Amino acid sequence: MDISCHKVASGHAIGPALVTHEAISFLGNVNPETGMVIDPAHELFGQSIAGKVLIFPGGKGSTVGSYVIYQLKKRGRAPSAMINLRSEPIVAVGAIISGIPLVDRVPEEVLQIECGILVEVDADRGIVRVLEPASGRLSA
């Protein structure tokens, strides 16, 4: 299944999906040394974002979040790509300075992709591709 998208930060990546319906504040929600979601109130608490295609509505919080994304990349703990419904400046700047593909303007149905399903993000071509068989692509 191919999904059209808008490029925010260039690049191409493939990885398992990690999906949340909640916004993410990289300063406070994510440990920059481990890539683990550390906010017990967040839907992804206890999960690692490292190497994942992180799918979330958008970012929130402090502008320091951009530098947390950069720290994650430098430590090898960053997501392989990010998909937002609507990107905002904090996540956009973090992705750009870190070289992490970031796309947005996707349908809300992307939030139905099951965690663990293999997803390809080709920001330069404006395509998100769900690579798993049709029988297990979207959750109910």
Regions found by a protein language model. Give the residues of each.
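Feature captures the catalytic cores and cofactor-binding loops of soluble hydro-lyases/lyases
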Residues: D2-A13, L18-R129, A134
